[in-house]
Amino acid sequence: MKTIFLVPIEPIDSRYTKQWYENIPKIIGDRISKLGLNPFEVITIDGRGANNATTTGAFLDFATTNMYKASQVEAISKLFMNGKVKAGDKFLVTDAWNFAITAIRYMSDLLEIPVEIHGIWHAGHYDPTDILGMKMRKEWPPHQERAWYHACDYNWYATNFHRTMFLRNLDIEYTQTYKAQRSGQPHEYIIPQLEALSDTIKEDKVIWPHRYNADKQPEIAEELKTDFNVVITAKMGLNKEAYYQELASSKVIFSCALHENLGISIMEAVLSGVIPVLPDRCSYAEMYPAEFLYPSTWTSSEENFLHYKPQLVEFIRDRMHHPEKYAHALGIAQDTIKNSYLTCNKMLDPLLDINTVQP
């Protein structure tokens, strides 16, 4: 029996990483059962030292994440040392910005135990609008990211926008782009919960769901408070259940993000029956109907926002007060999200030896 070793990003209650930690093993097991596949043993490689705190404006804590990853490397090393890793086993690293990839490939090559590595890419230095891209304007990060890319057999991206940006900004040779695949992410477990909230009574409020960080332009959301009841969830300290209730009771979800490779909070809102108002850029441009996209220029900077604010306010107001005009487009968006972005079957196929994706 082959083994899939899951190398998770540390689970943080306020982030989807906690849901991933709990649900990815279930998703893999359900896929195996549904298709009647040969069973895999699924082992999660936990780390130590993580906590629920995050560095301000970031997805995780920049110090304790290294403790967590280092202890994962220790555990993986013991598995190789004790003969628990066999030829043909798989590693799924759920955040590819993880030096465990280096250790896995190092041991696999030098101990002559061929394994397959799958890495899911999220944020990184390769995106100049991400916090890593803004804070680490150094020579070493792109070399590190390219090394991890080449060490993986499969690199997974949530959107075509994300994949294209990665390959372009890291100047990946064309002959090596076959390692980069687009797949939705493993979030299907949230679909029933959010659809059940779609009948929640909607209030005349605009929800802004992002981290309070420069790449999300919170100052624009603050400026919109002169025209709307704007709820900035980052300031509220909500747990996941309370956050979903706040989300589902809003008429509009608004983004002015300069950086977005997928946008989980927007998908959560749309499934809850909330109308999205999004810039025509980043991943939004490929994921959502034109009815929900305003010109990117309107919020490409705070200066531009102030210039175009009247047009943006009217754009939001129309969708808030006349939701019936956008019901059909909202249904299309919901179907697209569920079928293409909240499921990861394309990633699971090679992970489970279903030969529909060729590296």
Give the ranges of each region predicted by the language model.
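Membrane-proximal helix-turn-helix segments that form the acceptor-binding/catalytic region
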Residues: 134-155
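Donor nucleotide-sugar binding/catalytic pocket of nucleotide-sugar-dependent glycosyltransferases
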Residues: 150-195
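Conserved donor-binding/catalytic core segment of Leloir-type glycosyltransferases
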Residues: 182-226, 230
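Short hydrophobic beta-strand element within catalytic cores of glycosyltransferases
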Residues: 275-278, 285
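A charged, aromatic-enriched C-terminal amphipathic alpha-helix characteristic of glycosyltransferases
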Residues: 299-358
